[in-house]
């Protein structure tokens, strides 16, 4: 497949930046007022250290111009325009208001000088013969290689799960790369050298999220949108762990966030840790539920797909193309993304634990970070969890999954009634609960989130309500397994009362 006009060599590293100012890291100099025209603008103007104009062209789309303020990465202002990105910076009030940018035109291929007719008559037959021989050898090699691949290919892998679908128009170069013969033996990503090449060709476009780990940016690679998670230096172990898991086990699954590349780069005299994944414009399930109310069939679609992802993590697959069992350890609505087809995929494996039955080896990693206190199971809060038992970690995932089901159910419309989004235990703990706050509510008072009575009026939500209760048993071993949750939800989705929503 091809992407746009032909290009020779690797595309140069692009950088672009449009922000509305950074309240966490204010600039040291005086601020200027700038025109703000971007999807993330909160008004017609913003204030920052300088004003920016960025012109971005995604593959198959018309160029879009964004205006805003900049506080970080001033070195990007010195970048040269390319056929995908051009950026401009200035330092006076509203200096970016009437600025218009253009992209560098794609250079046409230079014409080859004509050859002498007599030389062509002599070399023509010779070259044709050599070409036929080369094609024959190449064809034989290709047939043998394809036969070897078919013998070793894992039956559960499908081509569709390996293609990055960043836009609906045109072909995907990244999809070609992920679908080619150069992927790693695990099938989880690209070889390390290819990963570093891809990482250095990504242009950062806009910051779409911030958290305790760092930032998430939307980037462009050859005109395709990708997500770039930039870890803070104090969270290096999370970056290392997530990179390690993606590069050593088979995690290609529709309901697990697709991994592309990982790299440690130096930008502006500081080290940055990048994790590049597929980009999903709906964002996290947490964000999606705050914006969107759900019909019962959509609530079920989200729940089933999340359960499929968790079941795939928890199961061990044997064989040369297998994977160890994995427990997430930080399952929550912020770590579940909503794809364009309104199915969920699970993200953030920085705290994951791996286990293989053959060696009975429990790989906990070396990360001092702990999970999110609001979603911790009672055995974690009262420090009774068996840290040497892999099943214990899976049981904590199930407790958290029940809380995510509760979040989905609250936003589901039944008889015209729906509640505002609230996090679990919103009515009994503060916004940022401490370990002791959660321990008192969950372990001492033995409280669980209140399940609204209205759920009993709908056959889908009544099943979800019962499932929540079975995820919240105080005895961890009595809780449902991820596989049982998946099968039960699929059975509900195929029941006569509701249409089939999971393909």
Curated annotation (Swiss-Prot):
Reactions catalysed, as given in the entry: L-threonyl-[receptor-protein] + ATP = O-phospho-L-threonyl-[receptor-protein] + ADP + H(+); L-seryl-[receptor-protein] + ATP = O-phospho-L-seryl-[receptor-protein] + ADP + H(+)
TM region(s), chain numbering: 119-141
Outcome recorded upon mutating residue 443 to Y: In HHT2; retained in the endoplasmic reticulum
One Pfam family it belongs to: PK_Tyr_Ser-Thr
Annotated GO biological process: angiogenesis; artery development; blood circulation; blood vessel endothelial cell proliferation involved in sprouting angiogenesis; blood vessel maturation; blood vessel remodeling; BMP signaling pathway; cell differentiation
Domain Protein kinase, residue spans: 202-492
Residues in the Cytoplasmic compartment per record: 142-503
Record SUPFAM superfamilies: Protein kinase-like (PK-like) (SSF56112), Snake toxin-like (SSF57302)
Outcome of mutating residue 77 to W: In HHT2; retained in the endoplasmic reticulum
Documented effect of changing residue 59 to V: Found in a patient with pulmonary arterial hypertension; uncertain significance
Name used for this protein in its record: Activin receptor type-1-like
Protein species of origin: Homo sapiens (Human)
């Amino acid at each position: 497949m091809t992407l746009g006009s032909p290009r020779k060599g690797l595309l140069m590293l692009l950088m672009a930046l449009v922000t509305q100012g950074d309240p966490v890291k204010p600039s040291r100099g005086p601020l200027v007022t700038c025109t703000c025209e971007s999807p993330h603008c909160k008004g017609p103007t913003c204030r920052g250290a300088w004003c920016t104009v960025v012109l971005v062209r995604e593959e198959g789309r018309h160029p879009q111009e964004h205006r805003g303020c900049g506080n970080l990465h001033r070195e990007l202002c010195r970048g040269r325009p390319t056929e995908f990105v051009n950026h401009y910076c200035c330092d006076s009030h509203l200096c970016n208001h009437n600025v218009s940018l253009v992209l560098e035109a794609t250079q046409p291929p230079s014409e080859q000088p004509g050859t002498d007719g007599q030389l062509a008559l002599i070399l023509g037959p010779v070259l044709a013969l050599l070409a036929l021989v080369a094609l024959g050898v190449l064809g034989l090699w290709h047939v043998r290689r394809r036969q070897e691949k078919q013998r070793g290919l894992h039956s559960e892998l499908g081509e569709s799960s390996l293609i990055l679908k960043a836009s609906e128009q045109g072909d995907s170069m990244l999809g070609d790369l992920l679908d080619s013969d150069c992927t790693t033996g695990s099938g989880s990503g690209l070889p390390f050298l290819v990963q570093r090449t891809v990482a250095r060709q990504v242009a950062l476009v806009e910051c779409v999220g911030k958290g305790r780990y760092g930032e998430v940016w939307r980037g462009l690679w050859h005109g395709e949108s990708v997500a770039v998670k930039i870890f803070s230096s104090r969270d290096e172990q999370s970056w290392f762990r997530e990179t390690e898991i993606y590069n050593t086990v088979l995690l290609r699954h529709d309901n697990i966030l697709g991994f592309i590349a990982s790299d440690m780069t130096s930008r502006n005299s500081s080290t940055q840790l990048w994790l590049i994944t597929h980009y999903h414009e709906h964002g996290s399930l947490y964000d999606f539920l705050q914006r969107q109310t759900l019909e019962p069939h959509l609530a079920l679609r989200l729940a089933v797909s999340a359960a499929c992802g968790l079941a795939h993590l928890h199961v061990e697959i044997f064989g040369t193309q297998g994977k160890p069992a994995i427990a997430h350890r930080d399952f929550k609505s912020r770590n579940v993304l909503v794809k364009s087809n309104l199915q969920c995929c699970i993200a953030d494996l920085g705290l994951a634990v791996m286990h293989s039955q053959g060696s009975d080896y429990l790989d906990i990693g070396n990360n001092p970070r702990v999970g999110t206190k609001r979603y911790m199971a009672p055995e974690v809060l009262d420090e009774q969890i068996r840290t040497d038992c892999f099943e214990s970690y899976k049981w904590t995932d199930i407790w958290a999954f029940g809380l995510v089901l509760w979040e989905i159910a609250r936003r589901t419309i039944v008889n015209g009634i729906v509640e505002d989004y609230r996090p679990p235990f919103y009515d009994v703990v503060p916004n940022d609960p401490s370990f002791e706050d959660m321990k008192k509510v969950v372990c001492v008072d033995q409280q669980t989130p209140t399940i609204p009575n209205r759920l009993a009026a709908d056959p889908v939500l009544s099943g979800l309500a019962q499932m929540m209760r079975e995820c919240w048993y105080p005895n961890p071993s009595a809780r449902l397994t991820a596989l049982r949750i998946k099968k039960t939800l699929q059975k509900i989705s195929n029941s006569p009362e509701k249409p089939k929503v999971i393909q």
